[in-house]
Curated annotation (Swiss-Prot):
Keyword terms of this UniProt record: Magnesium, Nucleotide-binding, Nucleotidyltransferase, RNA-binding, RNA-directed RNA polymerase, Transferase, Viral RNA replication, Virion
Name of the protein this chain belongs to: RNA-directed RNA polymerase
Keyword Transferase recorded: yes
Gene3D superfamilies linked: 1.10.357.80, 1.20.120.1390, 3.30.230.140, 3.30.70.2480, Viral RNA-directed RNA polymerase, 4-helical domain
Signal peptide (residue range): none
Any one Gene Ontology cellular component term annotated for this protein: virion component
One Gene Ontology molecular-function label: RNA-directed RNA polymerase activity
Alphabetical list of InterPro entries matching this protein: DNA/RNA_pol_sf, RNA-dir_pol_4-hel_dom, RNA-dir_pol_luteovirus, RNA-dir_pol_reovirus, Rotavirus_VP1_C
Domain RdRp catalytic, first and last residues per copy: 501-687
Enzyme Commission no: 2.7.7.48
Reported function: RNA-directed RNA polymerase that is involved in both transcription and genome replication. Together with VP3 capping enzyme, forms an enzyme complex positioned near the channels situated at each of the five-fold vertices of the core. Following infection, the outermost layer of the virus is lost, leaving a double-layered particle (DLP) made up of the core and VP6 shell. VP1 then catalyzes the transcription of fully conservative plus-strand genomic RNAs that are extruded through the DLP's channels into the cytoplasm where they function as mRNAs for translation of viral proteins.
One Pfam family it belongs to: RdRP_4
Subcellular location, record wording: Virion
Length: 1088
């Protein structure tokens, strides 16, 4: 057992260091004799500790338990009330506390004033501007740091340098906090007015960020960056991140490309040894200098100095430092503004009549034409999705807020809820459901707002529109997206591509006679000037489409969509400002519609096309690619002569002038070698990602539990690490220890062991080895997995009561009746289960399930209930396979060049040996014929789990299933009788297994699993034709080899002689694999 359990026991003796503290380890074993000893051992431990005796003699007596059984958890018992943090903190509070400069930020409340100066009373107070929104406390964070420092105070050599750097930074944090006292959190991990009133308002969120930064310090450069950001972010809560990260958009244009990867015709990355010189006009350097001067004005010293030193020779080797600075800048935390300021921000731009109306007209027409192009085919063919758009919308209705709280009756139960799905049910039950009427959002019914906070940017507002808007838009937007899926211009949606493909797209056409124009249009998307041309373009497109069909249902769908656009042209929003709710006319486009992403992409594409058509009046060039990715767009232009400084300058000036003619306040740049957009940046022909995920501050509070957040924390740590920002792993493990502990009483806590948290059960939180997903196959591992499966699904009385009410039942049967032609229990049950699952977002249901889960967990962590589960997990399959594999050492040379410099060494090594992949492996089953058949006739989308279940049924049952979903009998029987059906069986099983093995997450998504280099390390003699078995054997072998390579930087070869008799058994088993959902899998999903 790894490091975790060691850290756990050390951490417990660090935190509970008084005389009264006792730690009782609890063991379990799958061996029944040993299990009896485990139980005796536990009973005696509890008895001894009650009598105040030392447990040492027991550890001797039960050595067999400690050596051969598995640690399940540690029971910790302590009378100590928590002033421990303060006591320990004093030892570090040796420095000068920071003093906040109260004039740095434009908005008064963004200055780090004492809370009582910002909020006169508890009634006025809100923590929403500084809430860390994470279920762990500042005192825990401080404890985790001090624990690390104490553990490493005797380190030598380089390790000692790291210790000194971190200690030095922690002294700043400790001294500042100590001056005011450690703020105590309440039971919801929030900081109340009476705790904060005599302390600086941003103390907690600043300290969390500071701790996250100092625990990510390794080198001297890290130390300098961290120190500067920690000190300055104490005062500057508004613009620091923006200042520090601004130069990157220019830096990417300064490095020559000497060898790069390009996307070839097969959509694979292929090395190209081309050399492209960075052509940089003087004005660009002036702009960069201005940015650096602004940094200096804000008090930064070391960071601008590092940038200036790098500018001397602009080398790619030292560029990693630039990318480090860029990543670090996000870790100062989220900028959280008041809603009123976030909303007024968009309304500040004043109208000018001095705009180029021709350009606006062209822009609108391009939007119109694109909308028509996207929807033309489905409309002309009277696509069933557009006919049954309302049903499709209801089936995928989310359980997010509908903007207002209503009193709802479900049977005898009356509840208050804001959730869309509940409102829909209630409206249907009371005859208030009128999807054909889109409610206005004018001055009489202003839109309530949500918020989106990001580091380094202003807070943005989000419309919370009534559910009618979702229903009206859903089907049409789905069709728009499926068009975008096979259109390369839409980088974000393009079929199964990933960021690497988009990278190769850009580098492909860079040469001495081309330049790339890249623009950040986030300001334009939310500007008032965009609104009318944007909505009108969409409306005109819909009008043209309406004339292309005679189907009244399709016309109705298009008209409803049109109505949403008309309503939103006259939109008002409601903003709480102190006690009053202000109504403000809001003339801009905001997120919150179903169409937001798709429509913005269309608009941004239209925008760059408009600009390029103007540029084309003056220059002659070929547009090699145009791409739009979220808020950014970019294009590569190829001229017929080599590019000169003067050309770059002129094109740049012209582009900026053209944008200004449309009053678009955007950041447009021209370069010959690289681009920088929100999602990724390309410099020196290599691709970089910003490692800017905050660990100890969250954007908002959801309804995830401490366990979920521990998994999310780990998952964020992994993503950052892949992108080049590494936080100390021991610190992360310490946070997991804290966040997964369960309080039994005030003085009793239970801490789960590594085995519990890393086995893939419903409780999995992290991997014992970074980047490697292990599937336990030992007796003890399978035993504990089975034990956890027995208590995975928890009941909720409230949910059951709602689900048994007439309102709920009627809704579910309404959906089933509209969807199904004939009875189909799988689908009806599926709908009921889905609708019931949506109730989880209603807090009381969630809490109830959670409590049941915790109490079951507590029982389990004290003594696992052995239980024979008939469920088969992926572990069982791998366990059956494992014994038949023989390992030998092998050798695989490095043969690919690096293209992602920020990757950790071990991951980089594996990619350099076997290559990378530029596609997502299909793990949803959507590529199978049955899935396509269903979507041809029905709006129902079965999940991969359901397809997996259905495809293994008898042929007659599959046929009935298809017919009930509206597939004509002839098609259904043809399908079942054809070879396609047996191919599907294999395809779906494949997708399902990929899905279970999280092949598209973590670092596995970077590896080429079909690499011939990998294949040649595997030898499996061909026996019998069971492709599914061959598939799983190969996949297992690949994972084993890759995991071994990540761990040891060495290759192994696997030989498997799988007996024919076992193959059939295995094949049968493979059709009964249960999927396990855990905090770990949902954290992976959350990353997506």
């Amino acid at each position: 057992m790894g490091k975790y359990n060691l850290i756990l026991s050390e951490y417990l003796s660090f935190v509970y260091n008084s005389q009264s503290a006792v730690q009782i380890p609890i063991y379990y074993s799958s061996n029944s004799e040993l299990e009896k000893r485990c139980i005796d051992f536990h009973v005696k431990c509890v008895d001894y500790s009650k009598r105040g005796l030392s447990l040492k003699s027991l550890f001797e007596e039960y050595k067999d338990v400690i050596d051969d059984a598995t640690l399940l958890s540690i029971l910790s018992y302590s009378y100590d009330k928590y002033n421990a943090v303060e006591r320990k903190l004093i030892n570090y509070a040796k420095g000068k506390p920071l003093e906040a400069d109260l004039t740095v930020n434009e908005l008064d409340y963004e200055n780090n004033k004492i809370t009582s100066e910002l909020f006169q009373s508890a009634e006025e107070y809100t923590d929403s501007l500084m809430d860390p929104a994470i279920l762990t406390s500042l005192s825990s964070n401080l404890n985790a740091v001090m624990f690390w420092l104490e553990r490493h105070s005797n380190d030598v050599a380089d390790a000692n340098k790291i210790y000194k750097r971190r200690l030095d930074l922690f002294i700043i944090v400790a001294s500042t906090i100590n001056k005011y006292g450690v703020p105590r959190h309440n039971e919801k991990y929030r900081y109340d007015y009476d705790v904060m009133k005599d302390k600086p308002y941003y103390l907690v969120t600043w300290a969390n960020s500071a701790i996250e930064m100092l625990m990510s310090v390794f080198s001297h450069e890290d130390y300098l960056i961290a120190k500067e950001l920690i000190v300055l972010s104490y005062s500057n809560r508004s613009t620091l991140a923006k200042l520090v990260s601004s130069p990157m958009s220019i830096l990417v244009a300064l490095i020559d490309i000497n060898g790069t990867f390009i996307t070839n015709e097969e959509l694979e990355l292929e090395f190209s040894d081309k050399y492209v010189k960075a052509i940089v006009p003087d004005q660009t350097f002036n702009e960069l200098q201005e940015m650096i001067d602004n940094m200096k004005k804000a008090g930064l010293v070391d960071i601008p100095r590092m940038i200036q030193e790098w500018l001397i020779d602009c080398s790619l080797e030292k560029f990693t430092l630039m990318s480090k600075i860029y990543s670090w800048s996000f870790h100062v935390g989220f900028r959280k503004q008041k809603m009123i300021d976030a909303a007024l921000d968009q309304l500040k731009t004043e109208y000018t009549d001095d705009v180029d109306n021709e350009m606006y007209y062209e822009y609108t027409m391009l939007i119109r034409d694109e909308i028509v192009k996207m929807l033309e085919i489905p409309v002309k063919h009277d696509d069933h999705l557009l006919q049954d758009s309302e049903l499709a919308g209801l089936l995928s209705m989310s359980s997010a807020s509908n903007g207002e709280s209503r009193q709802l009756k479900f049977g005898r139960k009356t509840i208050f809820s804001t959730k869309k799905n509940m409102h829909v049910m209630d409206d249907i039950a009371h005859g208030r459901y009128t999807p054909g009427v889109i409610p206005p959002v004018n001055v009489d019914r202003p839109i309530p707002l949500g918020r989106r906070d990001v580091p380094g940017r202003r807070t943005r507002i989000i419309f919370i529109l009534p559910y009618e808007y979702f229903i009206a838009q859903h089907a049409v937007v789905e069709k728009m997206l499926s068009y975008a899926k096979h259109t390369r211009e839409y980088a974000e949606f393009y079929s199964q591509s990933n960021q690497l493909l988009s990278y190769g797209d850009v580098t492909r056409f860079l040469s001495s006679n081309s330049m790339v124009l890249y623009t950040d249009v986030s300001q334009w998307d939310s500007s008032q000037h965009n609104t009318q041309p944007f909505r009108k373009g969409i409306i005109m497109g819909l009008d043209m489409l309406t004339n292309m069909t005679n189907d009244p249902k399709v016309v109705h769908t298009l008209n409803l969509y049109k109505q949403t656009q008309i309503n939103l042209m006259d939109s008002y929003v409601q903003i709480p400002d102190g006690d009053v709710i202000k109504k403000i006319q809001y003339g801009a486009v905001a997120s919150g519609e179903k169409q937001t992403k798709a429509a913005n992409s269309i608009a941004n594409l239209a925008l760059i096309k408009t600009v390029l058509s103007r540029i084309a009046n003056k220059y002659s060039f070929i547009t090699k690619i145009i791409r739009v990715d979220g808020d950014d767009n970019y294009a590569v232009l190829q001229f017929n002569t080599d590019v000169t400084k003067q050309m770059v300058q002129e094109v740049s000036d012209d582009v900026r002038y053209i944008y200004s003619r449309m009053n678009a306040k955007v950041k447009a740049l021209v370069s010959t070698v690289g681009i920088e957009i929100a999602k990724r940046y390309i410099a020196g022909g290599k691709i970089f990602f910003r490692a800017g995920i905050n660990l100890l501050n969250n954007e908002k509070r959801g309804q995830s539990t401490q366990w979920d957040q521990a998994a999310i924390l780990y998952s964020n740590y992994i993503v950052n690490k892949l992108r080049g920002f590494e936080t100390d792993r021991e610190f992360i493990l310490t946070k997991i220890i804290q966040m997964t502990s369960v309080a039994i009483t005030g003085s009793l806590r239970l801490f789960p062991s590594e085995r519990v948290l890393t086995t893939n059960s419903t409780f999995k939180v992290f991997d014992s080895e970074d980047f490697i997903i292990e599937y336990g196959t030992t007796d003890d591992e399978v035993y504990i997995q089975r034990a956890f499966m027995s208590l995975s699904s928890q009941k909720s009385g409230i949910a059951d009561e709602i689900a048994s009410s007439q309102t709920f039942k009627n809704y579910v049967s309404k959906l089933s009746d509209q969807l199904l032609v004939s009875k189909n229990t799988i689908v009806s049950k599926g709908i009921a289960v889905t609708e019931k699952a949506k109730l989880n977002s209603y807090a009381p249901v969630y809490l109830e399930k959670r409590r049941a889960q915790i109490s079951a967990l507590l029982t389990m962590l004290q003594k696992p209930v052995s239980f024979k589960s008939n469920k088969i997990t992926i572990n069982d399959i791998l366990r059956d396979i494992k014994p038949f594999f023989v390992t030998t050492e092998a050798n695989l040379p490095i043969q690919y060049r690096k293209f992602m410099p920020t990757l950790p060494d071990n991951v980089q090594y594996v990619i350099q040996c076997i290559g990378s992949r530029t596609y997502q492996i299909e793990d949803s089953g959507s590529k199978s014929s049955i899935s396509k058949l269903i979507s041809k006739y029905s709006v129902y989308k079965p999940s991969i789990e359901e397809l997996y279940k259905v495809i293994s049924l008898r042929e007659r049952e599959i046929q009935l299933y298809l017919v009930s979903l509206g597939v004509p009998l002839i098609d259904a029987s043809t399908y079942v009788g054809s070879r396609i059906y047996s191919q599907d069986k294999y395809k779906i099983l494949e997708s399902y297994v990929y899905n279970l093995l999280s092949i598209n997450y973590g670092c596995y998504q970077l590896f080429d699993f079909n690499s011939p280099d990998l294949e040649k390390l595997i030898r499996i003699p061909f026996k019998g034709k069971i492709p599914a078995v061959t598939f799983i054997l190969h996949l297992y072998a690949k994972l084993e080899i890759i995991n071994h390579a990540i761990k040891n930087r060495a290759w192994i070869s696997l030989f498997c002689n799988y007996p024919k008799s076992e193959m059939i058994k295995l094949w049968k088993k493979m059709w009964n694999i249960t999927a396990l959902r855990s905090p770990y899998t949902s954290a992976n999903f959350f990353q997506d």
